[in-house]
Amino acid sequence: LARAKLRFKRAGVENAERVQLTGRDDDPFLKKKATQFDLVLVDAPCSGTGAWRRHPETKWKADAGLDRLVALQKAVLARAARMVKRGGRLIYATCSLIPAENEAQAEAFLAAHPNFQAVPAETVWTSVLPTPWPCGAGDYLKLTPARNGTDGFFAAVFERTA
């Protein structure tokens, strides 16, 4: 979270609140601020497979604990969803290339949370950035080293409808 403060400053963001939750359902911040945020970003703990080109040694650790990570991501998303107000958005991001952490996680979230809908990431991208959409068809942002010359990255945008 300390690095986020510097990144916000560089980006000119002044109205962001950085919070590290306890991971418990009875977290006092969750109770106090439920359904109050326009935008919640979940920078999910993940396998980091998208950073293999910069950290190739992590390839040998990729399968260690994947099931645990997927379960943790699911729990973090569910808690974060409680923070988003009606009409607000929840962004789920990983630096993973593994579908279980990305598309499957997004689809499972939508199935479990009918009060949210996917917002096509291309729509969001083109509304705020002057550069062309870097991905193929689909609702999610998925950058890959092979296609984009970047680290692997995934993002899904959800909007609370009720």
Task: Describe the function of each predicted region.
Residues L1-A162:
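S-adenosylmethionine
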